[in-house]
């Protein structure tokens, strides 16, 4: 009984850890949509994807900062981890998450 209780506790903790970033991302997207509607309503929305670009950059930067040791062990396993700095390790990050959107002006 105690083993099942511990196992369910581990599963719940795992679900909470996985669910928190998704909840944060959903709330950020809601705030982004509200801000875009307000800006569009008063007519000063100049950059269509600018806010989305900033949020994506911050989200993926925080993701890699939180998972930095895991990312380093996967991507640079042949190098000692204590010799790598963040600027050296950022070279090894996947390029698919570093796509920058071109800013477009709406007239």
From Swiss-Prot:
Its main location: mitochondrion. GO terms for cellular component: mitochondrial membrane; mitochondrion. It is found in: Mitochondrion membrane. The keyword Transmembrane helix applies. Keywords: Membrane, Mitochondrion, Transmembrane, Transmembrane helix. It is a multi-pass membrane protein. The chain crosses the membrane at residues 11-31, 58-78. Induction: Down-regulated in the absence of SIT4. The keyword Calcium does not apply. It comes from the Eukaryota. This is Uncharacterized protein YER181C, mitochondrial.
């Amino acid at each position: 009984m105690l083993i099942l209780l511990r196992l369910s506790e581990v599963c719940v903790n795992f679900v909470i850890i996985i669910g928190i970033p998704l909840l944060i991302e959903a709330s950020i997207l809601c705030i982004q949509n509200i801000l875009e509607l307000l800006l569009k309503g008063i007519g000063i929305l100049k950059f269509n994807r600018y806010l989305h670009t900033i949020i994506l950059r911050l989200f993926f930067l925080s993701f890699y900062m939180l998972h930095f040791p895991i990312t380093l062990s996967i991507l640079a396993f042949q190098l000692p981890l204590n010799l790598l700095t963040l600027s050296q390790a950022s070279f090894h990050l996947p390029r698919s998450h570093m796509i920058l959107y071109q800013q477009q002006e709406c007239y």
